[in-house]
Amino acid sequence: MHILEIPSFFTPYGGEFCLEQAKALKALGHEVRILSCVQLGVTIGLKDYLLLPYHRYEHQRDDVTIYQSFQRGLPKMVHHNVMRWVSIVESMFCDYIKKYGKPDILHAHCAKWAGYVAMQLSKAYGLPYVITEHLSLMSLEEEFGKAPSDAWQIPFLKQAYEQAAMVLPVAEELVEEIACYFGKEYRWQYLSNVIDTDFFHYHKRPSRNGRPFRFCCVADYSYRKGYDVLIPAYKQLHDSGANVELIIAGRGTDTVKFRNLLSEGMTSYGLIDKAAVRELLYESDALVLASRSEVQPLVLLEAMATGIPVIATSCIPQSLRIEGGSTIVPIDDIKGLSLAMGQMIGQDTDSKTISESIRHFASPEAVGMKLAQLFRDIIALR
C-alpha cells in the first residue's frame, strides 16, 4: 500500500507519534511518507520562526521521507492562519502526487486540521482517509471555550469526523469526552499510539544501596500537566524524611520562573531529546505525572516499556492502567499524590512483566499490523 501521513503538528512542536506510525507501517513493507506543514508561532519560539527554512524540501528521518514546509503564523489571526495552512497542504499534495503518484489512503493525525484537509483532498481526488485523534478535551476547550460552543471551527471538524472512513482515538474514553463538540455520528475504533519498544526496551535498574529513590517527570511546563500539584506533593514527601529525588524534563522547565518553584532534591533539565529521555528513565525508579487532562501520554508507555512503574491521575485511559505498573490518584490531590509516591518507594515491582505488557499492545509490530489491516479493508471497500 501507498500511505501518506499528514500530521496537524510536527517537529519542533511534537507530533512524534506520526513518525512512529510511519516507521511501523514502512517496516511491514508499505510505501509510507509524511507530508508536514508546521505553523510556527512567533510567541512560541522566535528563533524557529526566524531561522527555519522558508522553502519546501524533502528530508529523511529514521529512513522515512518527509516533505516539509513551515508556515509563519500571524498573531491573533486564527482563521487566516488555518485557511492558509490548509491551502499550503493542498498545494504540497499536488507537488507530491506529481512525484510519487496518488496514495492509496490518507492518514491524518488529529482532525484539527490534518483531518479537515484530508477530507478536502478526499473529495478532490477520490481517496479514502482515516483520522487518528490525539487531542484532549482540555486542549479543545482552550481554543473553543467550554461546550456548548459556537466556535467557527467546530462544524468543519465535525464534518471531517463524519466523512472519514474511520476515526481512531488513541483512547476509547476520548469519543465520549469530545462528543460535546462533535457528536458521535462517525465510525471509530480504539487504537493505541506506537512507541519504539526496541529503543525504550527493558533495562534492569541497579540496587538502591542507600541512594535516594528517584522519581522523574517528563512533561512540558503548563497548567494541564499539574506541576502545581506535583511539586508540593514531592515537598510533603521529602519533608517527611523520605530519601527521594525528583528529576524533571520538558519544555519550559529550565526557565527561571519554573526553577524558582523547586526545592531540595529537585532538578530540572528543560526540553531533552529522545535519547536523553531514555537515559532519564533508565536512571529512575518510577515516573510521576500529575496531569489534569490527557488522552494517551506517550511518556507513560515509554516509562513502563523500560520497566518502571508510573503514578498518574484519573484522567489517563483504562488502556494505560497496567496491573502492577500504574498507580492512579485523583486529579488535583496533593496529599493523595504524596501518599502514592511514598507507597511506591517500598513497592515490589515486576519490571519485566510491565515491559512486556506495553510491548504487547503498543509496539510498532502490534500497532502497525492493526493499522495495515484496517487500511486494506477500507481500500477494498472503495
Please state what every model-predicted region is.
Residues 1-60, 238, 376, 382:
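N-terminal subdomain of nucleotide-sugar transferases
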Residues 292:
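Aromatic "clamp/platform" in nucleotide-sugar-dependent glycosyltransferases that forms part
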Residues 326-334, 342-348:
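Conserved acidic donor-binding segment of nucleotide-sugar-dependent glycosyltransferases
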Residues 309-312:
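Short hydrophobic beta-strand element within catalytic cores of glycosyltransferases
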Residues 127-130, 138-159, 197:
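Nucleotide-sugar donor phosphate/pyrophosphate-binding loop at the beta->alpha transition
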Residues 256-275:
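Nucleotide-activated donor-binding/catalytic signature segment of Leloir-type glycosyltransferases, i.e.
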Residues 173, 194:
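Carbohydrate-associated surface elements
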Residues 4, 168, 207-225, 231-235:
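Conserved donor-binding/catalytic core segment of Leloir-type glycosyltransferases
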